Design a protein with these regions (language model features):
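Acidic, metal-coordinating helix/loop segments flanking the phosphotransfer/catalytic sites
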Residues: 30, 48-67
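A generic structural motif
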Residues: 37-46, 98-100
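Conserved acidic segment of CheY-like receiver
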Residues: 14-25, 29-33
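Conserved binding/recognition cores within well-folded domains
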Residues: 135-172
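CheY-like receiver
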Residues: 65-147
Length: 172
């Protein structure tokens, strides 16, 4: 199942994917996103997915997300169906996608070691609280702001600027 909701706020809109086979969890996360966006004046667009395959199809269509709130274990998970670890590997490997913050939302802590190569941004242990969602998104927004810092300089009487994270080295 796929659904999209947008919440208007003060910052650049971020796109969030919720991928969980538990409808109650999807609804809780959606409500937390709405509450957070209103309370903190953030602009969030989100989509819900019941399976990893549905989310992967979105990427195959050329769509992407800034944040993925991703379960690891899915009911009726046969050998042909992806779990959250496999989806993370595909996104990081096939698409060389390091920009998406993959956040595992799970009851299964034993997968933490398996996910190291995927470089998850965070783990949120179920049951989830609104406070934990706020903590995650505030950290995420701070990290994004740090990446957008600009270095300004003048060369040959022309003012220039460059995003600090794009600077490899300085020469004098």
């Amino acid at each position: 199942m796929f659904g999209i909701m947008a919440y208007k706020g003060g910052d650049r809109m971020i796109r969030v994917a919720i991928c969980d086979d538990d409808k109650h969890m999807q609804e809780s996360l959606s409500k937390y996103l709405l509450d957070y966006s209103i309370q903190c004046d953030r602009e969030i667009d989100h989509a819900e997915f019941d399976t990893c395959e549905e989310l992967m199809d979105e990427y195959l269509k050329g769509n992407s997300f800034d944040v993925i709130l991703l379960d690891i274990e899915f009911k009726n998970n046969d050998e042909k169906q992806m779990n959250g670890i496999e989806l993370g590997k595909r996104l990081r490997g096939l698409y060389a996608n390091d920009n998406t913050a993959i956040v595992y939302v799970t009851s299964y802590g034993e997968y933490a070691i398996d996910s190291i190569k995927i470089r998850p941004y965070d783990y949120i242990k179920k049951p989830i609280t609104y406070e934990r969602i706020v903590e995650f998104f505030e950290t995420y927004y701070l990290d994004q702001a740090k990446r957008k810092k600009v270095f300004e300089y003048t060369a040959h009487k022309v003012k220039n600027s460059i995003i600090v994270s794009n600077i490899c080295y300085f020469e004098s």
